């Protein structure tokens, strides 16, 4: 009986994760239309303003492609507490804030991928990671500055804690997901 575990070939996975540098470059060069809404909501909270209303009449810093000059509403469609999550990033200039958010998104998905490989939760083909990394849905999610990657990472960590019988931690992470976006709460029912 062979009790020797198969070694993980890390060199293949490191090469497979190389599109992250391309993705970060692309995210640096794009406007991140969806992230702009998060940024403006955080900026509104910092200025004691309602994140759901358009404040462009107060300052051009509140301009976003969604709210423009004519709209009464800002385009913010997330729970009120989500705007508080983005207040630290709203203290920074938009470009720097956007890049930090995208870096955090890329690091979180990389760490979850590393965790899956390390714990051998299931087998990931290294070459499939390259395909996913350069696929249009993934690139579009990053270039627009969407929060779905963070939501998926939090959901996977929550599932891991649930499998480890750490129900409180799992439930707390699901609650955090609900503060950012309501839809994951519906899935957890």
Model-predicted segments: where are they?
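Membrane-interface micro-motifs in multi-pass membrane enzymes
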Residues: 79, 139-152
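Hydrophobic core segments of transmembrane alpha-helices in multi-pass, intramembrane catalytic enzymes
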Residues: 109, 147-156, 178, 182-185
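Transmembrane alpha-helical segments of multipass membrane enzymes and assembly factors
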Residues: 112-127, 164
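Membrane-interface alpha helices of multi-pass inner-membrane proteins
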Residues: 168-189
């Amino acid at each position: 009986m062979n009790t020797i575990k198969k070694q993980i070939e890390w060199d293949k996975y490191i090469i497979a994760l190389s599109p992250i540098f391309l993705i970060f470059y692309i995210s640096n060069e794009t406007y991140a239309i969806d992230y702009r809404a998060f940024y403006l909501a955080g900026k509104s909270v910092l200025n004691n303003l309602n994140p759901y209303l358009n404040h462009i009449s107060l300052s051009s810093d509140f301009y976003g492609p969604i709210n423009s000059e004519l709209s009464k509403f800002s385009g913010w469609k997330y729970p009120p507490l989500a705007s508080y999550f983005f207040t630290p990033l709203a203290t920074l200039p938009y470009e720097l804030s956007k890049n930090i958010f995208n870096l955090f998104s890329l690091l979180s998905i990389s760490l979850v991928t590393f965790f899956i490989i390390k714990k051998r939760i299931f087998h990931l083909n290294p070459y499939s990671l390259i395909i996913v990394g350069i696929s249009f849905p993934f690139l579009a999610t990053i270039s627009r500055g969407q929060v779905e990657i963070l939501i998926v990472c939090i959901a996977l960590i929550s599932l891991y804690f649930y499998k480890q019988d750490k129900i409180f931690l799992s439930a707390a992470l699901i609650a955090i997901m609900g503060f950012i976006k309501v839809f994951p709460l519906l899935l957890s029912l």
